[in-house]
Curated annotation (Swiss-Prot):
It comes from Trifolium subterraneum (Subterranean clover). Pathway: Secondary metabolite biosynthesis; flavonoid biosynthesis. The active site is at 164. Keywords: Acyltransferase, Flavonoid biosynthesis, Transferase. It catalyses: (E)-4-coumaroyl-CoA + 3 malonyl-CoA + 3 H(+) = 2',4,4',6'-tetrahydroxychalcone + 3 CO2 + 4 CoA. This is Chalcone synthase 5. The keyword Acyltransferase applies. Its EC number is 2.3.1.74. Belongs to the thiolase-like superfamily. Chalcone/stilbene synthases family. GO terms for molecular function: naringenin-chalcone synthase activity. It holds the Pfam family Chal_sti_synt_N. The primary product of this enzyme is 4,2',4',6'-tetrahydroxychalcone (also termed naringenin-chalcone or chalcone) which can under specific conditions spontaneously isomerize into naringenin. SUPFAM superfamilies: Thiolase-like (SSF53901).
Length: 389
């Protein structure tokens, strides 16, 4: 008779969860930040709000973003004027867009990840899908399963409405699934489309305007599994430790509410200050067991909520400017893509590390950290170990 303990032992993987492939995708429509204020105020019939436009221009100039990608083209916005008005009932129009576009963009990223992985998609055992862009039943996980032609008995997990910290959440969940299920191969997809948050400007709600200056569309996909098959699967990063915490005294710092007018976005407190005040504690908890206290000796992937967050974290920890280079490069090229951002940065880092002839996927260093920040204020921490190139 086999004991429960023996069954349990047989079910578990031997080694740590590893990221085996990464794919990314963006809509075709590229938006230049320098000219975006003109477009935005014109398409929303707000050109008479001269002072507000100047304010928005300054927000865009300070954003450290050069370009973003958006599903919402001029044509789509002209066909859906309710989306352009500030707080006009428009949820139906927005939902009609995102229930199609979110899985479609997710599929684009997933196809690239599966190709890099090099294994048949029939070997995918689990699917995690994450989006803050709309809700539906059955969800985007189901739609993606159909679009990719995955097996009907893939174990799916759908995460809706998590916000900007969720790139860390999906890694934490994928790690637990991979390590507790021998042979598991987890497809992780984050897909974000700003059609839910786009709206015209308001004199009285400048936090909404901040979102209009920062958010972009993108999807990222990973394959995660333990015990890579030698000669076939090539690990990129190992996931060693994860944590999630709610920052003290931060309630209401970042809020999003799904309303008739779409997803509303609110910044109510000093978000960069809250993040920088709590980052030290998160790092000590993560790296004390490894005897690491010099945070310039690790590689960095931080959700780029905006440039002020990165500036304050750098200042607080006395980080060298190059530590946040991959993070800032992704912010500059794509804007804030919510949950997908940190996965884009992982991709950027491993590619640049190889191009620059460095010895590991983590900028030549062994250990690194990935941070997600978002509503709550919630902080996700993932300790990563790089792989030799």
């Amino acid at each position: 008779m086999v004991s429960v303990a023996e069954i349990r032992q047989a079910q578990r993987a031997e080694g740590p969860a590893t990221i085996l492939a990464i794919g990314t995708a963006n809509p075709a429509n590229k938006v230049e930040q320098a000219t975006y204020p003109d477009f935005y105020f014109k398409i929303t019939n707000s050109e008479h709000k001269v002072e507000l436009k100047e304010k928005f221009q300054r927000m865009c100039d300070k954003s450290m973003i050069k370009s973003r990608y958006m599903y919402l083209t001029e044509e789509i916005l002209k066909e859906n004027p309710s989306v352009c008005e500030y707080m006009a009932p428009s949820l139906d129009a927005r939902q009609d867009m995102v229930v199609v576009e979110v899985p479609r963009l997710g599929k684009e990223a997933a196809v690239k990840a599966i190709k890099e992985w090099g294994q048949p998609k029939s070997k995918i055992t689990h699917l995690i899908f994450c989006t803050t862009s709309g809700v539906d039943m059955p969800g985007a996980d189901y739609q993606l399963t159909k679009l990719l032609g995955l097996r009907p008995y893939v174990k799916r997990y759908m995460m809706y409405q998590q916000g900007c910290f969720a790139g860390g959440t999906v890694l934490r969940l994928a790690k637990d699934l991979a390590e507790n299920n021998k042979g598991a191969r987890v497809l992780v997809v984050c897909s974000e489309v700003t059609a839910v948050t786009f709206r015209g400007p308001s004199d009285t709600h400048l936090d909404s305007l901040v979102g209009q200056a920062l958010f972009g569309d993108g999807a990222a996909a990973l394959i995660v599994g333990s015990d890579p098959v030698p000669e076939i699967e090539k690990p990129i990063f190992e996931m060693v430790w994860t944590a999630q915490t709610i920052a003290p005294d931060s309630e209401g710092a970042i809020d999003g509410h799904l309303r008739e007018a779409g997803l509303t976005f609110h910044l109510l407190k000093d978000v960069p200050g809250i993040v920088s005040k709590n980052i030290d504690k998160a790092l000590v908890e993560a790296f004390q067991p490894l005897n690491i206290s010099d945070y310039n000796s690790i590689f960095w992937i931080a959700h780029p909520g905006g440039p002020a967050i990165l500036d304050q974290v750098e200042q607080k920890l006395a980080l060298k400017p190059e530590k946040m280079k991959a993070t800032r490069d992704v912010l500059s090229e794509y804007g804030n893509m919510s949950s997908a951002c940190v996965l884009f940065i992982l991709d950027e880092m491993r590619k640049k590390s190889a191009q620059n002839g460095l010895k590991t996927t983590g900028e030549g260093l062994d250990w690194g950290v990935l941070f997600g920040f978002g509503p709550g204020l919630t902080i996700e921490t993932v300790v990563l170990h790089s792989v030799a190139i």
